Swiss-Prot record:
Chain intervals with Acidic residues compositional bias: 253-265
Reaction(s) the record says it catalyses: a 1,2-diacyl-sn-glycero-3-phosphocholine(in) = a 1,2-diacyl-sn-glycero-3-phosphocholine(out); a 1,2-diacyl-sn-glycero-3-phospho-L-serine(in) = a 1,2-diacyl-sn-glycero-3-phospho-L-serine(out); a 1,2-diacyl-sn-glycero-3-phosphoethanolamine(in) = a 1,2-diacyl-sn-glycero-3-phosphoethanolamine(out)
Protein family (similarity comment): Belongs to the ATG2 family.
The protein, known as: Autophagy-related protein 2
Biological source species: Debaryomyces hansenii (strain ATCC 36239 / CBS 767 / BCRC 21394 / JCM 1990 / NBRC 0083 / IGC 2968) (Yeast)
Localization terms from the record: Preautophagosomal structure membrane; Endoplasmic reticulum membrane
Amino acid sequence: MSPQWMPQNIQKRLLLYVLQQLSLFSEIDLPNLEEVSLNNIVLKNVSIDPDKVGKLPGCNLRYGQVGSLELNGGVMGGVSIDANNVEIVIAPDFDMKEEISNNVQFSLAQSTADLANTLMVDKSSNEYESSDDETDTVMPSVSSKSRSNSSSSGTSARTRPSALSGVMTKAVEMALSRLQVKVTNLNIKIVSESTDLVLKVDEALLNTINGTRHVKIKGVKLITLKPEVNPGESSDDSPEQESPKESENSNTSDDDEDNDNDYGDESLMNSMVFTHDEASSIYMSATSQSFNKPSNNDDTAPTETAPDNKESPILLHIDDIDIEFEGLSNITNLEIDVGEIKVAAVPITPTIISIFNNISHNLKLKYYQQRKSNIHKQRFKSNLSFPQYADDNDEIEDENEQMPILDDNGASSGPFFDKLRIHNIIVSATSALLPTGQFASASNSLNFIFHNLNIKYKNEALIYGGIEVFKIVKITNDQEIEVLKFNNSTAPTNTEPNPSDEPAGSTSAPSNSSKADIRFEAFTKLDNEIKHLEFTSLFSKQAFVNLDKSVLLLLSNFGISVSSIYDSYNTMRSTMNSVNSFKANTNINGEPRDASSIGVAKESNLQIILQTASTTINIKLSDNLNLKAVIYPISFNLLKQGMSINKILISTVSSGIETLISTLSNIQLSTKSQEFKSFSNKSGYSKGSNDSFPRETILGSNLTLSLSKISSKASLKELKLLIGDFADFASSWQLLSLQVNSLKNSVKDKGFVMSSKSNKNESSSMLSNSMYFNQRRSRRSNFNNPSLVNTNRSNLVSFRLYVDHIEFCITNVLPKLGDFDFQLEKVSFYKLNNDIQGSIHTVKVDRNLGNGEAVNDFIYEFQRKRCNKINIPLILVNIKSNDKANTIDISLRNFLIEYYTRWLELLEKEIDENAVLHDITGQKRESSSLNSPSKRLDIRFSLYDCVIGLNPGRLDCKSLLIINKGNSDVTFGLHQFYIKSSLRNLSLLIIDDVKNINLSKTDREAASKPTSTAYISPLSWFTSIGYISVGNINCIHLGITVNTGIQEIIERNEKLGLQDNLALLDIKINSDEHQLDLCADSAHVLIQMINDLKPPLSFTDEEKIKVTVNDPINLLDEIGQNVFLNESIMKSASHSETFENSTISRKNSDANDINIVEEYYDGSHTSSQSLENGFNKLSISESDNAKDDASSFSFDEEHFSSNGADRNNTEVFPIKMNINLSKTKIYLYDGFDWKGTRKTIKGAVKRVEAQALQELERVKEHGSRKHLKRNMQVTFDEPESNATEDNYGNDQENDDGNSSDNQSLIGETLFQSIHLSVPKGSNPSSLTKNINKSVQNYFDNEDSNDSSINYNVETGRNYKNLKLRRSKNHKISIDLKNIEVNMAILTTRDPRRDKDVPDVKYEVTNSIDLRIEDIDIYDNIPNSTWNKFLSYMNSLGEREIGTSMLKASITNVRPNPELCSTEAMIDISILPIRLHVDQDALDFFIRFFDFKDKRFELPIDEIIYIQMFKMSSIKLKLDYKPKKIDYSGIRSGKVSEFVNFFILDGSELSLPKLTLYGILGMPMLGAELTKTWAPNIQQTQLSGLLAGLSPFRSIVNIGGGFKDLVAVPIKEYRKDGRLMRSLQKGTSKFAKTTGYELLNLGAKLASGTQVVLEQSEQVFGGEGSSARSPKNKNDKHGKIEDDDNEDIYTSGNTSKGNSNLLASSQLLNKTIAVDNDPYGKKKLYSYIELDESDDIDDKILENSLLLMNPKDIKESRQLQVVSEESELQELDEKEELDDEDAIKLVSLYSNQPENTQQGLKLAYKSLGENFEITKKAVNNLRKELNASSNVQESLKSMVKSSPILIIRPMIGTTEALSKALMGISNEIDSNHIIESKDKYRYDASEK
């Protein structure tokens, strides 16, 4: 203790010396000492020297200054230290030579002791021994505490003992016990590259009371300067508005202080007394000043202005901290009491992220620098010539001592603290913090409140504590609303876990903690050098959570922020671990350490246990609906790596009524690594059916959330309400999404990186580099560090969700519709990289009526397999997200979706379509305005083997549409969204009755087997169980556009100049190739099913007509005088012979005028007679000058079209559809597809044959066979004319016993198209033969002379051999090209629901435009030689581009908008048509389309009323070839049967244009057309018909040539006046016409002669026409390739292929040659002339002297040559599948030569072939003569061969002549070649 009388100057010098020896302050000189005395020392503006402070753990001191430092008192009286305006600037630094984790996580006690050691130890030389003695005396007492827990205590400097050391130590301890330190206005600035923080402390006080040291800290604030962040919300009335003035005042005062500091610094620099201990301090001081210069530009200290700036956000505020402890060297009884901590979450989130990212970045830089340095050292060390030094040994030893690998687990002297208490922790998710510590925002703020946090440190093994109250509060208008709270009642104790061996109660908190909301404890135990740490947290009270839109959004943003912080922390932690691992495995030279020098890290186990009570969450979706979730207790166990929840109950609360809608059972969250099977679609596909299978892979997941079952049930009303509220919730969510606490809005700095993805990428690249580095080192040291290996597993997913079973039931969909049950099994979703992928193994949706009725399947796997039998998921999902769009890929496989018409009927009664459409468009428009145009949503669907089931409403049939492969893209735009689909390989299947599905037991077993066997496609599966394929489509492209922003699109189109009509729903369908394969019964079922796929349309009388009127009507006002004419006059007028009398004229009236007569609506639906008398009139364009008829009604055809044209420019259509079909082929087959049809026919055949047998027995008994004198023929054709319409599908027996010729038939009419008849007394077995011949072209060659006849009735076998299945080849094919359908629905208003009637006179509902570019119908009947049945008249030349063969326009209007009924206006135009009608083809058409089955009859819907029907003029050119004559029809009055007596060739008809009015239904339309055109044809078209008669056709054409000889020159002369040229043209036309006709006539005669000769040769046993078959042409040697073929074409007792006159009388059926098709199908060709001249030849042949069986004469008149193919006679009906191939008859006029040269070549070829046949016959005759044993046999051989030797050369001559004449005639007029190719069937073998 110095005496008081010491002069002040000496005291200053002494104190200056002492302060300089502290090695803490720099540049302390006399000017810094304001007042110095032994009891009071005041220092001002003292700077702290960073060099003298030294290296701080983990950071470097950059700047330090104390504004004012005052020391009061002495050693005996206590010391008081007051420091004011202390400013410290530090920068974090991580040295690679130190353990980074220890530097980051160093303890507070260790850092405090090191700082004290730095301040009090004198490191200078022993210049002053007294000072050293005093310092050494004080050192042990101060540093013992700091060094007690250090692992490097041996490195501390040892002090020399002193005699006064004990006394001084006791004195110092007494002085320190009286020490009082007070620090005010402490500012600590932490600077780094990306983050600057300021820690402000208003006041810190240290004093000692009764041996207990008290530390009180007040006003702690943490402020961020960089990055620039959002401080949070602030209220307008908050005190922050007054802060600018205060900040200005404070800045002013700070500026004054800064000026003083600057002045003091200048005087200090210029002082002569200024001294330095070391020269290096000048450099460090200069460095310090240069570091501060950028901050001193504003004349302030570097840390003074930033904290006071209003733009600097405050991160947290602590009002006070009280710390109590005892002792100095050993601190005991440490208790920490913290008052209130307030945290602003908005600015602190990006700040923490920035800190973590900055640490990671600096660590990487240090790592790269160290690695580069190590590589450099290794290079020098590897060079042997370079001198080696041992100076590094000390560093290595130092490194080994200062870099411990193992943690120090030695027992400490005591716990770090005894008790920690924090009164309140308030975290605001939105509000900013004011400098006063209050939150700035008092409204719409969300606060997390932790009240009374207590933590007690019982011993080194146990820490426990709790949070008394934890709640989340929302502050709105100064009112607190509890978001989260815990129940204050007694919590259940059964949920408390028992994590350790000790009872939980023994280690629990005191009694007050038992009331805490949250309790926790941490237990540490060391067992066999393994450290066990158990942390247990218990939420023992029931929690209640109340959420609304704003709160949920704030919590969501807060959760995203916390997640981002966690990601950044993980990145930093992984970087630190990698760097520490690198340091631990390499020494200072960069070499890998030896294994012996590396300590083995002791293992540690961490156990975390979490247990909660039940939690109730209430979400307010709207004012009327809340969503409530009850979560059962949650259990989490880290060692078991899982969290479990027994159950979660979700319910809705509406009007106080709670309804359970969903239950989640057995929720498990596992962090254990698990492998699972996943499926993903392949990137590319090749052609084939099995290449679309997904790729199966095995993935692993470290985080899996699994649920055993999700069960939900809700009514449709509740679901609608829930979905509607969710939609409103989502839309308002988007509006509220830009909250202040969102991570995006919390940062103002645009360059700030919020995500840690880039850091992760950098870290991964660093790890890869380190791996490469260590691999290089391991080659030398044979050491590899596994922690540095980059295990980038591409098959490891970050998260997986798995649900084993999901059940969802929608109840009370409609009163009659029932419930819908949804079942999903094995639902799996996982996140791989940035994609979310998933699969649903099985999906099944059923409709359940709930009253015990059958369940209707809606969606299911098409084979109905169980889930465990399905190996491939039905649904695959892949969700991709990028900066531009979110894409969802959904793959659907093996689905069957059922369509039920009955459901539409039920829905139609409940749903208002207009309201739905309006709601949809309104919602879309509203939602589209919310969508951001920068990021769109795309949904892509892929379909593989999916099926659509079509179930009609009233029929038992069913159809399936199978989609082999397809894809669909759904794109959402700003004003519209698009659906683009492409479907490939579509198949249409149908079955007549679902009861006929043959799913046998074996099929069920096959369906239940695992799919490891061969994959079964839906087409194969359904055809195997009874369905038949009736059509297929190659490809369909579907585009749907839904326009939601109509007004915006209209404005855009106006700017672009587009005039296209708009529609709310625009549909476009483009399809490539289509094919239909139909029989008569399957076609009938298909048509009826299509009609039944729509709900039946029916109206009541009140809906159709106006029953009552408002005003009285005078019925006589609109009726003319001519109406009341005599009925007989009206009848005579309607049936007048003159065509003009059947027309009515149309007056010119106003286009906008229409007269509606009420009586018309009253009687239009009840009486067809009134329509016939009033409206069924005709207006033909040819009678333009016709006078007015008796009727005074006038019609304007352009009335509706003229008014409707203006609407398109202003009105938007609800729906517009465009359909384009490129190619469509329809194949019509004979036979029947349905088993029921075949069974009915077989039964009818059996009954007819039974009746015929009885009649035959009766005739035999009476011995009368007079009625068999004529040739009788059984028929299988259309019904007779006397069959009534009431017999549709009914078995009808037609007995004509009253015929004039006394000839009666036994027969039945089936399906209105099949007539079975057998003449009484004839052979009944011939009926089966005739049926087989008609259907399959099959003819059983039995010997007619066989006396034994097997009847079907007796044996019961032959009728089973009926060939009634579908024929192998089609009979007719229809080829349609470029079908275009444009449909526009102008209104969807239903007058029954929408009573808002538009103010218009009429209403146009829809319009349909149909165009077909080409229509070709091909004749493929085996008995016909013609090619095209119908086609365009190509002889007129090529038509214009864009013209269509058929155009039809249909417009439906509502004459009265108040009524539902509509009327149609039809306009049809057809191009000229060319017809080649063969009677067999015509009969097939009639039989095909007249087929009616009573099983598929439908009630008549609302009959269409045709208001106006227009038909353009039609030009026809007809060729007709009759085959048979129905004499019974002639006798019954069928006048049209006389047409079959004539052959027509080129008959021309011109049907005039007509207009019909008031037609009720299509049947009446056909009758009216016939009624109108028939008189015109009879009166004006007979000349064109008669000109086409075959015998007169050539004469007429030659006469036309003579006419051209005169008419053409006159016409040409009138045109140009050139006489010679006109005569030349006329002569040329005459010569061309006449020459062609003469040559054509010669060719016909030659061909006819050839036919007669071939038939004659065949009668005598020759080959006949079969010699021209392809088989005989190719088989030159006459060998039979297959021995079985010989048996096929021989019969009875004959052993050779040919029969002669003596052997059999059936000569026309024995010599058919077989052609083996190269593709494996047997085709039989027979060339025979069936043209115009054939009938003459047939008559000549009929009257020939050749002996023929009279019964076969009529069969030969049909000129059919058929083949026989043997079949196994099996009772099973499946033998019909192997039906016979049809004989292809080819005309002699086919393959005509185009010129003379080709004609001569074909003639020469024909002569050579026929002479070759003659040569073979001569050779055979020579062999037979040589082989004959007597003259009789030789004569017999000569008689048999002579006719053939004579006729065959004649056949060759006639054939050659016809070919030559055809070539010459076609060269004269080449236009006939086109008609020839269209008319005659083409044969490729001729070329």
